[in-house]
Amino acid sequence: MKRDNDRQTAIILSIVGIVPVIWLALLIAPSISGGLPEIAANLATLFDNPFSIKLCGDSLKTVLILLLCYGMGIGIYFSTRKNYRRREEHGSAKWGNVRAIDKKYRQKPLSENKLMTQNVCIGLNAKKHRRNLNTLVCGGSGAGKTRFYAKPNIMNAARNSYVILDPKGEILRDTGHLLEKKGYEVRVLDLISMEKSHCYNPFVYLQNDNDVQKLVTNLFKSTTPKGSQSNDPFWDTAASMLLLALVFYLHCEAPLEEQNFAMVMEMLRAGAIEDEDDPSPSPLDNLFSDLMIDNPDHIALKYYHSYHSGSSKTLKSIQITLAARLEKFNLESLAALTSADELDLQSLGEKKVALFALIPDNDSSFNFLVSILYTQLFQQLFYAADHIHGGCLPMPVHFMMDEFANVSLPDDFDKILSVMRSRGVSVSIILQNLAQLKALFEKQWESIVGNCDEFLYLGGNEQSTHKYVSELLGKETIDTNTFGKSTGRSGNYSTNYQISGRELLTPDEVRMLDNQYAILFIRGERPIMDFKYDIMKHPNVALTTDGKASPYKHGEVTKDIASIAIWDIDPATLPEKEMEETNWELLSDEEMEALFINNQTN
């Protein structure tokens, strides 16, 4: 762009230069017949009266001669012109100005920003700075991904809902009280202590046949161990057909209270083939036979007949395959957690909600449920934005995906990432290194990085990440010199000066990054090296455990509506009418409580 501008400027100046050439030609035309001596002799006189131009017979000839000379000079200039980029011969990379970039992107007040480093924020109103709010955070264990990025941004309690993947429950424990005081409704999917969790039933969010298909596909994908490859995909395909038949039946025919995975397991057990030589139908076969009579075109029947076309031995193997996939739902804790729904996913785009997904950091057995949650969240939020709210959610939703690599995501996550901005949805992808992202999305990882306008590097010890950051920083042009010395009778000493290029930071320098610094990339800006955010300087730190506030506890009784002691009641004060009606009466808990409250009021 700079070179194009220089060329345009040169052309414009060349055209403008024609005017003084014509003026000079007309000025010297009367003296041209005497040759150069006469022109030189009259030159001082001519310039004493520069606008005293006299036309003569030689005027046209003089103008043409000087224009020809001028044109030849311009031609020689452009033909020999060099394309120099001084101080940029080997690269133009340099560090960005922290204050200038912060001034460009920061909004007021502080809560209207995403905190990137100690001195740089980026405003939440993406229409002002025209950058999306997707952020890729990369840092090794102990680099401060949670403390220096995730927690400060949650503490900001910005004008959006949060979906937070929280290994160990640390973020919830530290910031739960703050979020409630800032008007957030806190909901928790707790896969560590399921008895404390809000219930989550994926069946509630099945709106059409496509949703059922996506649920089953996602369930099989997320329950497949990483790196495993089946030599014979027939069994998984057949098992998925059986599961589709069961889910479609429950979705279309069962009452709401029976639409859950616990009932899927009951149906699977009802269809168990005990004796391969016994041709008698199972209770599940009878159930679908009745459906055949009522609705022979039912979609559940199509999948059930596809599954049921094999021999008894094959069907039994298919059932075992599906039972192995769903074996976690035999646990009472998980069956209870998925029996009803309290998460109300669509409301996240309508009011301030903080949804925490707590997962064990040392056991991934139940992480498949978070994978299903992510998929259905994207479906619900995108549907609400497109069909209810005119294209954009009234309450923006931000996904804080800490330990991103621990949960399976949809294969088309890169496409989801590219279209979520317009709907008011954004994500923070938090990784230990880029190798994790490459392992999850071997072919799409670059697309995912490209759809994040902010990349925050906190430090680490993984070589490919060092190389990537170094290449992202680019090369700068530097001065170098070499020294030469020869000894002897005619010895001499020489110094040669030259320019060279080097990376702004080499890979080993990236590895040696001081633990108090972070490197921030914003699309279209110079890279920034700045201090990591000091959580103790956050204005809301007093409401968190870092500021000595009490830890947040979920799933426990925190409010006592009424406390009544039986011995405080005098039987003589009870209404006489009720005592006369009968000698005794068996009352429910609610009736006893109402009676005691009425007695205390009187």
Residues of each region from the PLM?
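Basic- and hydrophobic-enriched, low-structure N-terminal and domain-boundary segments
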Residues: 1-143, 147-152, 195, 486, ...
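Short, charged N-terminal helix-start/capping segments
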Residues: 1-8, 58-112, 281-307, 326-358, ...
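Extended hydrophobic/Leu-rich segments
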Residues: 39-46, 52, 56, 486-490, ...
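Low-complexity, polar-biased intrinsically disordered regions enriched in Pro/Ser/Thr/Gly
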Residues: 108-113, 224-234, 256, 479-499
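P-loop NTPase motor domains
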Residues: 128-425, 440, 444, 450, ...
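Conserved ATP-driven motor cores of ASCE-family P-loop NTPases powering translocation/secretion/packaging/pilus
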Residues: 417-419, 423-519
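Short, surface-exposed polybasic-aromatic patches that bind anionic ligands, especially phosphate groups
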Residues: 534
